[in-house]
Amino acid sequence: MHFAFPPRKSSYSHPYAARSSRSPFLRRTRLPQYLGLFALGAFCLYFLFLRSPAPTKPPPGTPGAVVVTVIDPDLSKSYIEAIKDNRKDYAARHGYVTFFPNTTDYALGDSPKSWSTIPALRHAMTLYPHTSYFFYLTSTALIMNPSLSLHSHIMAPTRLESLTLTDIPVVPPDSVIKTFSHLRGDRIDFVMTQDQEGLAGGSLILRSGEWAKYFLDAWFDPLYRSYNFQKAEAHALEHIVQWHGTILAKLALVPQRILNSYTRDQSGRTDGIYVEGDFVANFHGCQRDENRNCEEEMQPLL
């Protein structure tokens, strides 16, 4: 007997019916693809954040470091020249170069002009792509011991490991996020200090590389610039260091007098106060305090 339509199959599927033999085959063929994608992702993370920079020989004439100071054109001409001469003298002793952009060189919108520090460093990296170190120093500071090179004084791996402050709150006094208990000196790309208020960004060193570019781009994110941080880029830096492990993993905090001695400290602390022979004297706060004059305070040390 013939039917007009094929007989209807039962909609009931036996609970123990064998699955199609194609499914395990497809899983087996796709597994290498998944593993490959995972391996590629892991490699990218390693390349960006964990791998030590491959040693390459820079072109002849490449400076060992760039000293970056951002200049406010509203400062007096004599003050600006004194700051520049201080950096130029230091740079000439060690084969470094200087870079003095103005705060007005970068489009900051409504953000405070102190944000210009970040694009200035990024700009310097573009101008000197093969240079090892970028040393940012605020215009309220002087280099007081020009005999100290960045490498021997701080950045040599064994020296840097001995200086690094480990397992301490990133933002004093009671941040729950602490510095790593151990970092290899050759994997540290960002060096700075703390003061009694938090991270002290007036003097810092960046090692050139893809990570440094990533860090500066992250720090200069429009979201942070538009957010009303009380201390602008300083508080933005504290935020990203504490909550982005890829940045904390490259950061070394060193004792304040190694890189950023203050000439006075209103908190009463003395461990960060400038002593003759220190690398840097920072007249921290002299621009914000109406009762202080940076140029007058610096004059005895120029």
Q: What are the roles of these predicted feature ranges?
A:
Residues V70-D72, P101-T104, L137-S139, T193-D195, ...:
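Active-site-proximal beta-strand/loop segments in catalytic clefts of secreted hydrolases
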Residues Y16-H130:
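N-terminal anchoring/stem segment of glycosyltransferases
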Residues P63-G64, H94-V97, H130-Y133, S139-T140, ...:
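Loop/turn elements at helix/coil->beta-strand transitions in domains of secreted/extracellular proteins
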Residues L75-K77, F99, A107-G109, L142-N145, ...:
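Eukaryotic short linear interaction motifs
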Residues S78-I83, T103, L148-L150, L204-I205, ...:
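Short coil/turn segments at secondary-structure boundaries
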Residues P119, E197-L302:
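Catalytic core and acceptor-binding pocket of nucleotide-sugar-dependent glycosyltransferases
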Residues M1-F25, Q33-F43, A54-G64, H153-K178:
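Fungal intrinsically disordered, low-complexity polar regions
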Residues K113-M192, G198, S203-G209, K213:
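GT-A fold catalytic core of metal-dependent nucleotide-sugar glycosyltransferases
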